[in-house]
Amino acid sequence: MIDLMPKKNTFLLKKKYKEDSNNSVINNLFDFFGKEFCFHQITLTGFPIIWIDKTLLIEVGKFLYHLSQPYIMLYDLHGVDERIRLHREDLPKADFSVFYHLISIERNSDIMIKVPLLENDLILPTFTGLFPNANWYERETWDMFGIIFNNHPNLTRIIMPSTWKGHPLRKNYSARATEYEPFFLNEQKEDLEMEGLKFKPELWGMKRKNDNVEFMFLNLGPNHPSAHGAFRIVLQLDGENIVDCVPDIGYHHRGAEKMAERQSWHSYIPYTDRIEYLGGCVNELPYVLAVEKLANISVPEKAEVIRVMMSELFRINSHLLYISTFIQDVGCMTPVFFAFTDRQKIYDLIEAITGARMHPAWFRIGGVANDLPQGWNILLKEFLDWMPKRLKYYINTALKNSILIHRSKGIAEYNKKEALQWGVTGAGLRATGLNFDVRKWRPYSGYQNYTFEVPVGSGISDCYSRVMIKVEEIYQSLFILKQCLCNMPSGPFKSEDSLTTPPSKECVFQNIETMITHFLQVSWGPVIPENESFQMIEATKGINSYYLISDGGTMSYRTRIRTPSFPHLQQIPSVIRGSLISDLIVYLGSIDFVMSDVDR
């Protein structure tokens, strides 16, 4: 094991560091902090992973944040229970680790900082002074692993109920309900749970009154149509003005990351559909791509085109629901019924291809489940002829309506700097004028072969600009679908790799080893080599990604699912303070989120 503990903070004694632009960020880190205090882990993630001692964490964060091309977005932050990991001989000694995934927009590159921790010292300094969006990520890391972040503004549970015992993502916390005592909700327990839901303003630094006014505290949700799911926001009100608010999440949590530790690499695919239940196949894509990296599996060209086609169909489907419900939130009912008619056409096409509608579980490691059926092209062409006219109808009848424009333009504004501070991705970020679409910047599944534009805003993201970005994205998705229709290649729809595809009858009858391998993989699942991989995609609501750790087994050792909706909801208080309740309703409609995506 490697000791990263510096004997003294030698980097603090150096003069102001002059960055070498010809050096990689790794070498700049090594030059400044000393190579002996940094360990570079080689993985299949596609970006450098640097282990450092926790005493250097804040300084390393500041160093990366203040580079000439800075790592300006904290993309993700979470933990790993390292205690029973078998293949970590060359890594620093650790019972737990916390990783900090940072993105540099100017470099179009990522870096991950990992901090090893021992079980008797699970304490780290908070990152919130540098990145405000670290707040919720640190709360979730404490919630799931019990790692403490010193000087955190309010280190309380965020996903699990406040009455919960234990930290679910620890390896000694069972994933099976059968290993626990039967659960009974008697009157005493019910009272305890209800007390746990009671909001206490003082715990959040809120005053009940000031010299002139006594504030009202109002629960919006968790069962309110404008909350778009099981989501509660506690509002501190002065009349109808929002003084402050506290989003409360976790009601839709299903333990998706824990489930991945007890499912085979194949059998976890259906769970990915339900992370963001409107995205369908889009959610499957980052997972199967990450597993394919681990297994070094190449995907046939036809499978890549089919994956893109299905992803864009689900993108349009999700955007139609978003646009129509946004219009409904502002006060117009008719478009939502028209949108469901249009979405039915998409579902008919999806069902014809996959056999299912919302949750097909159709992508496979190495390809897709089946070849395209006869007549798929006719259904797709009919939809491509239909949709542009309908989209024009939405724009002319609703989105150009003066009342809607007045209710949404200039409401819930933020700029590019604020968006990056809070980890905003997708249409919300692009509305600020930043052209960052993973399909263009970091192409996957052959997106580099398609011609399409990335819609961007004029500099300020408000409710109206966010919805209009999504409208234009539908046009671009239709253009991509037309290219899929005209250029669908022939050939196989899945890889012939033995990890993904059963062998042919000829091979089975001629080679006993082939039959044995097939039996083991069908019975227990394929064994994926030990390593780490990462894949991000441009999902329907922003950037979605899977960070996978394989320990050389038939199941994932750690599956981290980073969803866009989680940071988008964390941003709400900073945007909506000082606004009216009616503005909050429009703002919530403009974010585009579902709670399954937030809570996982």
UniProtKB/Swiss-Prot annotation:
Its EC number is 7.1.1.-. It catalyses: a quinone + NADH + 5 H(+)(in) = a quinol + NAD(+) + 4 H(+)(out). Residues 1-190 are annotated as: NADH dehydrogenase I subunit C. The keyword Nucleotidyltransferase does not apply. SUPFAM superfamilies: HydB/Nqo4-like, Nqo5-like. It comes from the Bacteria. GO terms for molecular function: NAD binding; NADH dehydrogenase (ubiquinone) activity; NADH:ubiquinone reductase (non-electrogenic) activity; quinone binding. The keyword Cell membrane applies. It is an enzyme of class 7 (translocase). Residues 214-600 are annotated as: NADH dehydrogenase I subunit D. It is found in: Cell membrane. GO terms for cellular component: NADH dehydrogenase complex; plasma membrane. In the N-terminal section; belongs to the complex I 30 kDa subunit family. NDH-1 is composed of 13 different subunits. Subunits NuoB, CD, E, F, and G constitute the peripheral sector of the complex. This is NADH-quinone oxidoreductase subunit C/D. It comes from Buchnera aphidicola subsp. Acyrthosiphon pisum (strain 5A). The lineage of its organism: Bacteria, Pseudomonadati, Pseudomonadota, Gammaproteobacteria, Enterobacterales.
